[in-house]
């Protein structure tokens, strides 16, 4: 098995190759003057199985690059390709929200199913998207890695999900932290006032670990942090698998009172402090 890196996951691919005790295949990436993407497999390929690791932070570039890498590898005699897309782009457009919309991940699933033999990702936003694929679709969970990272940073914490849909993440983290877990519930007090508080637990005088699969604009989590602080919470650490963090998301979170924001290297950002390399190796 050879490990091939896309341009957006070079460090992560190196970590995976090292754990697998194999050399990272040399790939050249560049752009033509008109901005079209160029890839070239530089090393000689003497294996019929390849793993491409290419996260999809710059979504459209990553998708085209992956298609080109697959084509180049097939030409070099590779028979089986596993695509590891730690952050799988377009996964949130998993249904029609308005008439006439494309179901983006379904369209891409058809492409992936024709060019690779297996797809691996980490914490997809909705797991039912596996049904769009006609190849094995495997997903791993990086929440335990996030929980391990904060284990010595919090004192007798409670673990909170930002909503009921993320409760499973809180439950997973709570087992590692040996802590109680809950989710934040919104209660409308009036037409203009909403209260956000843990469903059953009391955050007063407690350290808090809030965990979700993705932080995008940071607005919802920042509001929750601010209200938890007002309710007497002590240290608050916010964590997510995919730190998309659009615009001033980090500023919102720190201004609201977060002590630290933690993410993984599925989506490289300044808070990507936890690697999913071991999770990927376990899935391979």
UniProtKB/Swiss-Prot annotation:
Cofactor note: Binds 2 Mg(2+) ions per subunit. Mn(2+) is also accepted, but the activity is less than 15% of that obtained with Mg(2+), when assayed at pH 9.5.
pH and activity: Optimum pH is 9.5. The activity declines strongly above pH 10.
Gene: prs
Similarity annotation: Belongs to the ribose-phosphate pyrophosphokinase family. Class III (archaeal) subfamily.
Listed name of the protein: Ribose-phosphate pyrophosphokinase
Keywords, sorted A to Z: ATP-binding, Cytoplasm, Kinase, Magnesium, Manganese, Metal-binding, Nucleotide biosynthesis, Nucleotide-binding, Transferase
Gene3D superfamilies, A to Z: 3.40.50.2020
Enzyme Commission no: 2.7.6.1
Quaternary structure note: Homotetramer.
Binding site for Mg(2+) 1: 125
Thermal properties of activity per the entry: Optimum temperature is 85 degrees Celsius. 70% of maximal activity at 72 and 95 degrees Celsius.
Provenance organism: Methanocaldococcus jannaschii (strain ATCC 43067 / DSM 2661 / JAL-1 / JCM 10045 / NBRC 100440)
Location of the active site: 186
Keyword Transferase: yes
């Amino acid at each position: 098995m050879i490990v091939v890196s896309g341009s957006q996951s070079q460090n992560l691919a190196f970590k995976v190759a090292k754990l697998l005790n194999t050399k990272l295949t040399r790939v050249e990436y560049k752009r033509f003057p008109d901005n079209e993407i160029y890839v070239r497999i530089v090393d000689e390929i003497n294996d019929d199985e390849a793993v491409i690791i290419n996260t999809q932070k710059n979504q459209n570039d990553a998708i085209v690059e992956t298609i080109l890498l697959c084509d180049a590898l097939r030409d070099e005699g590779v028979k089986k390709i596993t695509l590891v897309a730690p952050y799988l782009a377009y996964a949130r457009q998993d249904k029609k929200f308005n008439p006439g919309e494309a179901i983006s991940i379904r369209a891409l699933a058809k492409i992936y199913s024709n060019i690779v033999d297996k797809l691996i990702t980490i914490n997809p936003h909705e797991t039912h998207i596996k049904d769009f694929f006609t190849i094995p679709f495997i997903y791993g969970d990086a929440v335990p890695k996030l929980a391990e990272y904060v284990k010595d940073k919090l004192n007798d914490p409670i673990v909170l999900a930002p909503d009921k849909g993320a409760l499973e993440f809180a439950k997973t983290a709570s087992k590692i932290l040996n802590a109680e877990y809950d989710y934040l519930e919104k209660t409308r007090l009036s037409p203009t006032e909403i209260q956000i508080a843990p469903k059953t637990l009391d955050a007063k005088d407690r350290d808090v670990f809030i965990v979700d699969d993705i932080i995008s604009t940071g607005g919802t989590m920042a509001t929750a942090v601010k209200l938890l602080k007002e309710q007497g919470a002590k240290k608050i650490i916010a964590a997510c698998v995919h730190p998309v963090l659009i615009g001033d998301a980090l500023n919102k979170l720190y201004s609201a009172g977060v002590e630290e924001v933690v993410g993984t290297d599925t989506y490289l950002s300044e808070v990507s402090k936890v690697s999913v390399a071991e999770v990927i190796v376990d899935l391979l």
